[in-house]
Design a protein with these regions (language model features):
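Extreme N-terminal starter segment of soluble prokaryotic enzymes
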Residues: 9-13
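Conserved N-terminal subdomain of the carbohydrate kinase-like
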Residues: 20-32, 49-130, 144-150
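Short catalytic helix/loop segments, enriched in acidic residues and glycine
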Residues: 28-43
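A short, N-terminal amphipathic alpha-helix
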Residues: 40-52, 201-202
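Short beta->alpha connector loops
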Residues: 59-61, 133-138, 158-163
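Structural preference for beta-strand elements that scaffold enzyme active sites
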Residues: 128, 152-154, 178
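Conserved phosphate/ATP/ADP-binding segment of small-molecule kinases
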Residues: 147-150, 161-208
Length: 208
């Protein structure tokens, strides 16, 4: 009963990709499956909160059943844009034995390339903001729309965005509390091999 009450209190705004993935690991391989940062954040967070808000974009090729699954897990999809005649974001990657390092094989931005995120009025009072792995310029646009700063802002990113949109990423990072990246990404972002030195350098970029 106590857990149920706590679960209802926590409001989370989730911004990220709702996408198609093709993933290969040493333990198995998938072709085109439903994936995306926001999809997994939403489903995972549903075990802890009944008050989840989603801001993302998909093409008309994205299965309605997958959207229904999110809604069944108490994810409000009012902020999910569906672009007719366009294709959903697609990412393909190969993970190494340690499951911590990976190679990006293919990235098709598709609808994400011109995505203009709109934070609905009803989403403005969320206590927590989770900026999932997507274009840093989109993450920044969401930050700019927040009238009241959430209690905690978390930003996830990856090497692809560092390679192609580093300036946008550093701008978004100035406004966040927590940055989630792996060892390889921390070294690339900071230019330091030592993870202790990397963390200290990244903290100066914004994350606490």
């Amino acid at each position: 009963y106590t857990i149920y009450l706590q679960k209802n209190k926590m409001s989370i705004l989730i911004v990220g990709t709702v996408a198609f993935d093709a993933i290969e690991t040493p333990f198995g391989k998938t072709d085109k499956i439903v994936g995306g940062a926001a999809t997994y954040i939403g489903l995972s967070a549903s075990f802890f909160s009944n008050n989840l808000k989603l801001v993302s974009v998909v093409g008309d090729d994205f299965p309605k059943e997958a959207i229904k699954t999110l809604e069944q897990h108490n994810v409000d999809t009012k902020g999910l844009q569906i672009k007719e005649g366009e294709k959903t974001f697609f990412w393909s990657g190969k993970y190494h034995n340690d499951m911590n390092t990976r190679d990006t094989i293919e990235t098709q931005l598709n609808v994400l390339e011109k995505f203009n995120p709109i934070v609905p009025k009803e989403y403005q009072n969320c206590e927590f903001l989770m900026l999932g792995n997507l274009m840093p310029s989109v993450q920044k646009k969401v930050l700019d729309q927040m009238r009241i700063r959430p209690k905690l802002i978390v930003l996830d990113t990856m090497n692809f965005w560092m390679d192609h949109f580093l300036q946008d990423l550093t701008e978004a990072m100035k406004e966040v509390d927590v940055l989630t990246i792996n060892d390889e990404e921390a070294r690339q972002l900071s230019g330091e091999y030592s993870l202790v030195k990397a963390a200290k350098k990244i903290q100066k970029m914004g994350p606490k």
